[in-house]
């Protein structure tokens, strides 16, 4: 239980509940947008790869999107720059994503307008799809959205 406003009204429910559709507020201090969901990451490299496994989860609070995903690359010799789609919210600026993998080398991610682009750790050289052939990626990131 906690108090609200000057009259210290009490909320008796076990949790805060938001409506299914956002009810915008003109007051910037009002939390009026919360959403949790799933999305399926898809190849955005242009190679048309079909991931063996692709699951993604996100939480959006106001204009902040935090996500995690597991992506398993198929066996491929494709040399296009590796990337996959991000959660269903446009980002305002580029942001970094953390990637853990069984790829045998450090990887990093950059969240841009088209998705999550994968780079070798400490470099912005392209990582080819072939470099991730048969590999499992565990990805997490946070970015700002305008919606």
Label every PLM stretch briefly:
Residues 36, 62-64, 134-138:
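A general secondary-structure signal for short beta-strands and their flanking turns/coil
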Residues 53-63:
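Acidic, contiguous internal or C-terminal segments within carbohydrate-active enzymes
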Residues 1-47, 68, 75, 102-104:
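Intrinsic low-complexity, repeat-rich intrinsically disordered segments enriched
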Residues 63-71:
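Short, well-ordered beta-strand segments enriched in hydrophobic/aromatic residues
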Residues 16-18, 31, 39, 58, ...:
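Generic structural hydrophobic/aromatic packing signal, biased to beta-strands
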